[in-house]
Amino acid sequence: MTEVKTKRQSASLDRRKLLADPIMVTTIVVLIAFLTLFILYPLAILLVDSFYSKNGLTLGIFKRVLAMANFRTSIANTLKVGFLVGILSTLLGLLFAYVEVYVKLGKFSGGLFKVVSMLPVVSPPFVLSLSMIMLFGKAGLITRFLLKIYDNNVYGFWGIAIVQTLTFFPVCYMMLKGLLKNIDPSLEEAARDMGASRWKVFATVTFPLMLPGLGNAFLVTFIESIADFANPMIIGGSYDTLATTIYLQITGAYDKEGAAAMAVVLLSITLLMFAVQKYYLE
């Protein structure tokens, strides 16, 4: 009882010290104002537009949206791309992380490897899509002028999947690199001393220890993929995802309420993935 009371007094003292610091108070106020203005307020408007009509609170907007064939198709398209990109990005990120941690690279080659690994992160989100079109499109530098292929179509499902994988795998790479570095090397050394090959050590020791991290990496890239707008808009062609469907619902159909309802569906999928990550993987 005394220990609990002491902790409460200590926490109260810390709060008073915090509130006595004008710089810290100003920082907190600015952060709260920023979150309210740019996150909470738009989210509130989104919910109001999707649940309220002239007749008051209603689910009619969602019923109307769910009845749209293009919306149901875009949900299926988004989930298919998201799962594939999540799997491919996780595998590619694992490969890059494994090479950096376990393979001894030279100073120059190691530096070049890190630059190549992180290049998609520092590039604008649409650069890889444009590069794919310019290099492998019907008039692409590689397909048309080097390989003499004149009918190559980079648009659609596979175009989105490839570009998003190249865009988001560095996120998995950074997550898994830190995870591999934190694995106790004595566990792997013990397996090697017992005669296990490098592959068997990875399969029986390293990989099981990485499973929660792999799950986190998959969910993060899955969320990034389904929320991505720039790449599907540029290289998606007629393959619509939720993000592009929401955009076209506003700009093409001038249906603000319908777009808001679609955005709530997308937000719900994202929050569900965050919940899975929070309660099952952490």
Predicted feature residues:
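Membrane-water interface segments at the C-terminal ends of transmembrane alpha-helices
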Residues: 21-55, 67-181, 209-229, 259-278
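A short amphipathic helical element positioned immediately N-terminal to and/or at the very start
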Residues: 14-15, 57-66
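Short, Lys/Arg-rich, polar N-terminal cytosolic tail immediately upstream
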Residues: 1-20
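Glycine-rich helix-loop "coupling/hinge" segments at transmembrane-helix boundaries
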Residues: 54-55, 134, 228-253
